[in-house]
Amino acid sequence: TTPTASGNQAMSIHDITFCRPSATVSVTKISSILSDPVNGTTNPKRIPDAIVQYCILVSNSGSATANAVVATDSLAGPFTYVPGSMRSGTNCGTAASVEDDNATGSDETDPYGAFLGGSTITATAASLAPASSFALTFQVTLD
């Protein structure tokens, strides 16, 4: 563009795309019934005293590392947390690292942390690389 006043200059810029890597984090929660007091582990139903396992899966589908990842889940509902049932890992099927129920100790950085505070489950990861995930599983008894 040609300036119309002396001392002014202008330039037109278009069609520029900035490609900055970014993290794209998603959270999925799934459940499966492990057993109930009537059917045991054979075709269990969601009835009182059934044991249900939940998995919180946190995934990064972006092109950059996500840092200081925190996922929380409220345990409000007609169920009771099963103490000592928390496990962490890279996916729901293989989450086997034992997590205690408190927010202290070496299990909080192994490489994932998890704890129960009041009625909230919190899962943490210092970082989550592109195309990776971490999972936290825990169990509840239906009231």
Regions found by a protein language model. Name each.
Residues 1-143:
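Exported/extracytosolic protein signature
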